[in-house]
Regions:
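Thiolate-centered catalytic microenvironments shared by cysteine-dependent enzyme domains
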Residues: 16-110, 127, 168-169
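Positively charged, proline/Ser/Thr-rich regional signature most characteristic
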Residues: 1-36, 105-168
Length: 169
């Protein structure tokens, strides 16, 4: 279990948002404490359509580590489940700075870079906002809800289907 608030994000702030990227040293320490090392291959899953596990995989990959999502997440796992907590010994995970090329900021969004809003369409349109203090979206952003990347059973669409979906972008 990799906690969002302790490992995958820094504390919320008005300037950086609800789940800002974690400090790279704190991220490395959190993973090392969980027994995830520099050379480990991580397969992540969640029960949220891949949103949380996807964040872990993205963070690991932009740091050059080997990581993948379990397609379909927990709901497609066909084996038995357990309630036992697996503990791994502390590992070595060297802190690495976040690569600038993998990140955008407000100035990037304001200067015409393509911005995709992956939230639900009703949140994008400002019709419903159950989480954030303001409804709506970044001016100029396009709505491509992450749920559109998945089939009815929660698995990712084929690469061809995803290419077609994003061809208009």
């Amino acid at each position: 279990f990799v906690p969002m608030d302790d490992v995958l994000a820094d504390p919320p702030s008005k300037a950086r948002g609800r789940h800002p990227l974690p400090d790279h040293d704190a991220f490395a320490e959190g993973l090392a404490h969980l027994g995830i090392g520099d050379t480990d291959t991580v397969v992540a899953y969640d029960d949220a359509g891949g949103a949380m596990a996807g964040r872990l995989v993205w963070l690991l990959r932009i740091l050059g580590r080997d990581a993948a999502l379990l397609d379909g997440g927990l709901q497609t796992w066909e084996g038995e489940l357990t309630t036992e907590v697996t503990r791994r010994p502390r590992a070595e995970f060297a802190p690495t700075s976040w690569p600038d090329a993998a990140l955008a900021d407000i100035e990037d969004a304001a200067t015409g870079e393509l911005v995709i809003d992956a939230r639900g369409a009703e949140r994008f349109r400002g019709e419903s906002e159950p989480i954030d203090p303001k409804a709506g979206h970044v001016p100029g952003a396009r709505s491509y809800p992450m749920t559109g990347n998945l089939t009815e059973d929660g698995r990712f669409r084929t690469p061809e289907e995803l290419r077609e979906r994003f061809a208009a972008v």
